[in-house]
Structures are given as structure tokens and as C-alpha cells.
Design a protein with these regions (language model features):
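An N-terminal, well-structured beta->alpha segment
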Residues: 1-64
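Electropositive phosphate-/nucleotide-binding environments in soluble metabolic enzymes
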Residues: 12-19, 44, 48, 73, ...
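A glycine/threonine-rich phosphate-anchoring loop and its flanking beta-alpha core
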Residues: 19, 112-196
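Local beta-strand N-terminus motif with an aromatic residue
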Residues: 30-32, 88, 171
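Conserved beta-strand elements of the Class I
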Residues: 34-35, 90-92, 135
Length: 197
């Protein structure tokens, strides 16, 4: 029996790993990012730790910080519009599984416009094109969404979770920076650690 194993193009690990961002971006010729995160990470300064690196390197970006816990179809749809309006050619996802899942949904619909919305990608998705490149910077150690080919979105109309599986949505680069995780409240860090176990 033959099995297939899909991984990111490259992963960086260690305290301060976010400082590799300018090199990662320049080496790939990417021009403008849509930063996908949530208001809590903006409020507590965790996202700022990444944005400061982008600012210091004069990297263009716009922020979509409306990610909700357990993101919904409408949440992803708003992100798709933000990405198109920003004319971003790559995505930087900062956060836990919700930010990663939202970024995947945004990225795959933007590059596969024949699909009306994320609902049409439930199950094993039939996309043909790779999603916009995603650089994933996890702030939790729970779902490993920065390295997987699946994402979970809530369909509000049916009131159920959709699992989407698509090799085209795996983040191109994972940057696992312990300093981002240190910055979270201890209770959240502990809870996501238990989730990983």
C-alpha cells in the first residue's frame, strides 16, 4: 500500500523565529500580505510582535482581524472580500486554529473562483489551484493547523461544522515562534496544550 504525506514547503522553529519573515517573503517575491488574525491578539499585542517585523522591513500588508472563534462561512466570506480589496498575493495567519482555518478558506476560494463560496468545498475539496501562499504563525499548540490540509468552518444556515480537506490549502511556510506563545494568557496556553495531548 502506498501512502501520501504532505508537509509545508518549509518550517522554522524557535524563539524569535518570526524574524525570518522578511527573508521568507523576499525569497519568494511576494509583494503584499493580508494578515489574518483576531481582535484579541491585536488587543494583547501578540499580532503586533509580527507586524513590527513587517514594518521594520517595509513589507506591505493589510489586516483582517475579524476572525471569530470557530469561524463561520460569513466570517470567511468577509475575509475573501478583504483579500480581494487588498490585492494581496499572500496571507500571513497569526493565531490558533481559527485564524489558520479562516486563512485557508480565504486563500483557496480566492485562487479557485469557480467555487461560489466555502460551502461548496465541504468534504474532500475538488480544487485545482493551490491557495494563495500562507505563512502560518501559530500562537497556540493545539490543532497543528499550520501543517495540515484540512480546516473546519461553521455553516450558520445548517448550524453544523464543515470539515474541508484539500491538499491545495496547506500553508507554504510555518513559523513556530515560542515568543508568540509565551505572550498568551497562561490559562489559554495550558488549555491548548491539553488539546494537543
Amino acid at each position: 500500500m502506498v501512502n501520501r504525506f504532505i508537509l509545508n514547503e518549509v518550517s522554522y522553529f524557535g524563539p524569535g523565529a518570526r524574524k525570518e519573515l522578511p527573508t521568507v517573503i523576499a525569497s519568494r517575491g511576494w509583494k503584499k500580505a493580508l494578515v489574518v488574525t483576531d481582535k484579541g491578539l491585536m488587543k494583547f499585542g501578540v499580532a503586533k510582535m509580527v507586524l513590527d517585523v513587517l514594518d521594520e522591513a517595509n513589507i506591505a500588508y493589510e489586516v483582517f482581524d475579524d476572525v471569530k472563534p470557530n469561524p463561520t462561512v460569513s466570517n470567511v466570506t468577509a475575509g475573501i472580500e478583504a483579500c480581494k480589496n487588498a490585492e494581496a498575493d499572500f496571507i500571513i495567519a497569526i493565531g490558533g486554529g481559527s485564524s489558520m482555518d479562516t486563512a485557508k478558506g480565504i486563500g483557496v476560494v480566492v485562487t479557485n473562483p469557480e467555487f461560489a463560496d466555502i460551502v461548496s468545498l465541504e468534504g474532500v475539496a475538488p480544487t485545482k489551484n493551490k491557495c494563495l501562499p500562507i505563512v502560518a504563525l501559530p500562537t497556540t499548540a493545539g490543532t497543528a493547523a499550520e501543517t495540515t490540509i484540512n480546516y473546519v468552518i461553521i455553516d450558520e444556515k445548517r448550524q453544523q461544522k464543515m470539515v474541508c480537506v484539500d491538499p491545495n490549502d496547506i500553508p507554504a511556510v510555518a513559523i513556530v515562534d515560542a515568543e508568540l506563545m509565551y505572550s498568551l494568557p497562561k490559562g489559554l496556553t495550558a488549555a491548548t496544550g491539553m488539546d494537543a495531548m
